[in-house]
Amino acid sequence: MAGWIQAQQLQGDALRQMQVLYGQHFPIEVRHYLAQWIESQPWDAIDLDNPQDRAQVTQLLEGLVQELQKKAEHQVGEDGFLLKIKLGHYVHVSSRTRTTAAPWSWLRCIRHILYNEQRLVREATNGNSSAGILVDAMSQKHLQINQTFEELRLVTQDTENELKKLQQTQEYFIIQYQESLRIQAQFAQLAQLNPQERLSRETALQQKQVSLEAWLQREAQTLQQYRVELAEKHQKTLQLLRKQQTIILDDELIQWKRRHDWRGMEAPPRSLDVLQSWCEKLAEIIWQNRQQIRRAEHLCQQLPIPGPVEEMLAEVNATITDIISALVTSTFIIEKQPPQVLKTQTKFAATVRLLVGGKLNVHMNPPQVKATIISEQQAKSLLKNENTRNECSGEILNNCCVMEYHQRTGTLSAHFRNMSLKRIKRADRRGAESVTEEKFTVLFESQFSVGSNELVFQVKTLSLPVVVIVHGSQDHNATATVLWDNAFAEPGRVPFAVPDKVLWPQLCEALNMKFKAEVQSNRGLTKENLLFLAQKLFNNSSSHLEDYNGMSVSWSQFNRENLPGWNYTFWQWFDGVMEVLKKHHKPHWNDGAILGFVNKQQAHDLLINKPDGTFLLRFSDSEIGGITIAWKFDSPDRNLWNLKPFTTREGSIRSLADRLGDLNYLIYVFPDRPKDEVFSKYYTPVLAKAVDGYVKPQIKQVVPEFVSASADSAGSSATYMDQAPSPAVCPQPHYNMYPQNPDPVLDQDGEFDLDETMDVARHVEELLRRPNGQSGPLSPPPAGLFTPARGSLS
């Protein structure tokens, strides 16, 4: 309910905007009386493109109806009676919605309203003003846009009044002109009269004719002056319109597209609804002025008067047609981009939208949109207006869609839900370029009829660059191409040119954005993390981040050439880190439990003076996507230990928290946080009772050289089946080292071979899963991994 409380504190223009959101489709009374229920529902969790979510939408709608009925029944008094009637009416409307195809539209409407309500509250909270109207950092520019719209409204109303005055003046002029013609006809009739009467009538007619012709000449000049003044006013209006349209289309819309280009690298861009409202206002004002200009042309044709007006009107008519064309073609945009890494034979979706679709009657004759995939060269030719009709570089299934108008939200859009790239035709590769560096784009095109077919526009828009793959193993390298393009492409570039080199700080910004978006974490890369990455990329030992600011990173360094001494590229290693965090360790990263970006020597330096049992988690240098444990424990042979890295595959078998819980001798998370305080909330609880008579087995992390004496004496069940938080303190005498019985799990550097241990775990599982009475050979466990002290399995 907190959101509605904040919404009620809005003032001024923000309050008016919020009031406009609510209407007959979702009355503000419903929002007020069901605020707590509304804000507790998962509106954003439903995928509007997934028909399988329809049941959830219907369930939400039924819940709303039930809550409304309860609220309506409890209304008393005169005011309560009126409210009861209104709520009851909405109950009836909502009940009808349940039985039709409207639930999707209903959900879309509510999401639209709640999103914009939250936006208004957020904008109000983020800023301040002397008048008490809270606005965000962009408010000044938005205020200027709204002021210009008000100015345009006033000048358009002024030219409308001037046009009406011109029309009235011209109509009266025509009446007087007809009177002049009638007088001339009367002169012809004077020949039939006698001379005396004819002379008398002729003198009166001549006086009247002279007076009328003088008036007509003056009025003709006045009319011409009115026409010129009106044309000049239209010229000034169009100048202001062009300026406003440039701000909205070339600044605001381009900025939205730029933020959209970085999708997957930062938070989603703000809603298009504000932009659409501006574009719709532009469309209304442009169309009003166009109609005025056409009426002025009609008046000139109705009563031709020699002068410059015809040429002026032809010029402003051509200008306003250009303005309309720019508005329509520029506001045909891709709201939901297709995946930038596109795998053949895989379903994908996209959404295109016309931001002025509801204001120019485009929706009265719903247009069809077609999607095709074209190459980089074909995209260049298209932007040069070269003839590329019917050229494509592949075949997309289900590539045609009719645009739909959603009356509640006022949007005209086409949702491609089931497209699939059947085949792709590649160009000849250049030099060392791989298939994952080749870029394509999805072309969306349609034809719009504006204003009852008065104008017809061919519209086209290109998606962000797309890299086509045929196998999942190509995904990582394709993502690198997409990242480099999204981050470093210049606005207005030739498709799809990108710099071959960028400065290290530029790459830092891109990596940080990508990291936060991919891991879905507010904890980004620190200066220490970036320093580690710089040292890794440049193979440099300098410990000052500023030393790298002037260095350039080439595309080859980023993802074409292996890092010195390793068999992977910089991006492949970094992408592996993001993948393992995203899939398995995101909570621990957010908690600050994973130090991550340190090498083995740095870990040694950090731990060397710490108490025994202090450990840290770092990303492996040798394994892509590997995470390893380094810990301090003094022994006759060594005092620092490194566990062999485990990757995404091992993380899916047993969680990091459970693995750490298994190792009782790991006590403190670097620098000095008790392990259980950090990780215990993530431990998997042990089932107290058997299910269906069976006891569920567990896999536990064991390092053979670190097994406590108590565990040895307790037997195998304690070692392999128990799962409990480790003690906060583990006395040193409980450690039992086995130097006389070297174990192949630890290498000479003290690294634990997890692969061999997992072989043992799988062997145990195979034994436990065998049905009773089953016979047949079973592969023996790896030698040397089970000792008598740990018990035996039978």
From Swiss-Prot:
Function: Carries out a dual function: signal transduction and activation of transcription. Mediates cellular responses to the cytokine KITLG/SCF and other growth factors. May mediate cellular responses to activated FGFR1, FGFR2, FGFR3 and FGFR4. Binds to the GAS element and activates PRL-induced transcription. Regulates the expression of milk proteins during lactation.
InterPro entries referenced in this protein's UniProt entry, alphabetically: p53-like_TF_DNA-bd_sf, SH2, SH2_dom_sf, STAT, STAT5_CCD, STAT5a/5b_DBD, STAT_linker, STAT_N_sf
Keyword match Isomerase: no
Family statement drawn from the similarity comment of this UniProt entry: Belongs to the transcription factor STAT family.
Name of protein: Signal transducer and activator of transcription 5A
Domain SH2 per the UniProt entry, residue ranges: 589-686
Taxonomic placement: Eukaryota, Metazoa, Chordata, Craniata, Vertebrata
Organism: Ovis aries
PTM notes: ISGylated.
Superkingdom, taxonomy of origin: Eukaryota
Pfam family, one: STAT_int
Entry keyword set: Activator, Cytoplasm, DNA-binding, Lactation, Nucleus, Phosphoprotein, SH2 domain, Transcription, Transcription regulation, Ubl conjugation
GO biological process: cell surface receptor signaling pathway via JAK-STAT; cytokine-mediated signaling pathway; development of secondary female sexual characteristics; female pregnancy; lactation; lipid storage; luteinization; mammary gland development
Subunit structure: Forms a homodimer or a heterodimer with a related family member. Binds NR3C1. Interacts with NCOA1 and SOCS7. Interacts with ERBB4. Interacts with EBF4. Interacts with CD69.
Keyword Phosphoprotein in annotation: yes
Disulfide bonds: none
Modification type Phosphotyrosine: residues: Y90, Y682, Y694
GO cellular component terms, A-Z: cytoplasm; cytosol; nucleus
Tissue: Found in mammary gland and, in lesser extent, in ovary, thymus, spleen, kidney, lung, muscle and adrenal gland.
